[in-house]
Amino acid sequence: AILFRLVGSEMCIRDSYLLEHVGVGGQVSWAIAGRSESKLEGLRASLGESGRHLPIIVANADDDTALAGMVKSARVISTTVGPYALYGESLVRACAENGTDYCDLCGEAYWIKRMIIKYTEAAEQSGARLVSCCGFDSIPSDLGVHFLQKRAKEQFGSYFPKIKLAVNAMKGGASGGTLASMIEAVKAAKSDPKLRREMNNPYILCPEKADLGHPQKSIRGPIFDQDFGQWSAPFIMEAINARVVLRSHMLSGMPYGDDFLYREQMMTGKGLKGRLSAFGLSTVLDLFALSVFITPTRKLVQRFLPKPGEGPSPEAQIAGYFDISLLGQNSNGQKLQIRVTGDRDPGYGCTAKMLAQASLSLAFDFDEDNRNGGFWTPATLMGDKLIARLADHAGMTFSIN
C-alpha cells in the first residue's frame, strides 16, 4: 500500500494526478491521511466521482501510537507537511523505526541533517529508505547532475569535476509551503549562531563524512556568464539544491573528485536588458532576505505571502513550466550540456507529479529482499528509474543539447 499524508494544495494536486494516473482499487492501493477528517472528506469530494471510494486515515502528528499504526499499514509514506522542522519529525521517526519507505518535499537542510543524525541507525536496522527533496527542490538538480555525469562518463571516459546549472526560464506561483520553510529557517538561524554557521556550510547534508570541505563558489550577485553568454543572478533554490547534489556525490563515494564544484544561477538575458535584470533580481533577493531576518518586517512580509497549502489556480498550473540547463566541463576543456524541462508550474503542478512518481518508484522499482535502509537522495536511490518515470508519466524531459 501507498499512503499519503496531510491536506494542502500540493496534496490535492498530487492526489488528483494519482487518481488519473493509477485510479482507485487497482494495482496501487493508496489512501489519504491527516489530522482533520472533515478536511480529508472535503479533499476526497473535490476529486469527483472517481475518488469516492478513496480510503481516509485520520492521524495526528503528535500521536505516536496512531502514526506507528498508520506507517505499519503502508509500504510508502509520502508527506507534504511543512514546515518540516515544526511538524515532520514524528513521521520520520515512525517510518525509520518501522521499516516503511518515506519521501517528502522538504527543502530545510538543517532539519534533514538532524533527521539523518538521529534516525540513520534505526532506518538501517529496519530497512526504511527515506528520501527528502522530491519536488522542484531538488529533483531537477539532483537527477540532472546524475544524467549529465552518466553521459560524460560514456562520452569522455570520466566525470566532470565542475558543473553549473542555469535556469533559462520558469513560470509559476510562489509556494506558500516553501516560503514558510524559508522563513522558519531564517528564524532558527537568527536565534542560534551555531546553527547559522552550519546552514552556511554547503556540506551540511554530509555529516557521515565531516572532513568534506572543498570551498564551493556560489554566485552572490549579478555576473556575466561566458559559457552561457548571458547575465545571471543568484538562484534562491541553490541553498538546498546544491547541498542535495553534494550529498549524492558523497553517498556515491565521491566519484566526481574531492574538488567537485557545483553552482546554480538564474539567467536574465544578454546586453543591457539582461544586465539590468540581473542587478534587479539580485537586489530583490537581498531585500527579501533582509526583510525576513528582521522580526518586524518579517511579520509584515508574511501578511502578503501565500500561506502553506495555498497555491495557484489550475489554469495557472497548466500555464506554468520550467526550463533549465546543466553544463559540465573537465580539465581538458571538454564540455557537455543537457536540458531538463517540466510542463507545469514548478512549485505545484510539476512538484506534485515528481513526488507522486518518487512514491511509486519506492513502491515498485526495488527488490524487497534487499532493503538498503537509510537516508538517500533521489539520484542515489532512484536515479535512472525515476528519470524514466518522470519522462514517461510526468511531463518532464532530460536531453542532451
Language model: regions and residue ranges:
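Conserved Rossmann-fold cofactor-binding substructure of NAD(P)-dependent oxidoreductases
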Residues: 57-76, 80-86
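Short, conserved SAM-binding/catalytic segment
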Residues: 43-52
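Hydrophobic beta-strand scaffold residues
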Residues: 101-102, 130, 398
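ADP-ribose/adenylate-binding Rossmann-like module
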Residues: 83, 92-112
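Conserved glycine-rich Rossmann-like NAD(P)H-binding loop of the short-chain dehydrogenase/reductase
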Residues: 23-39
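Rossmann-fold NAD(P)-binding glycine/threonine-rich loop
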Residues: 106-128
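C-terminal catalytic/substrate-binding lobe primarily of soluble NAD(P)-dependent oxidoreductases
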Residues: 125, 150-401
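Single conserved hydrophobic/aromatic residue that forms the stacking wall/gate
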Residues: 1-8, 13
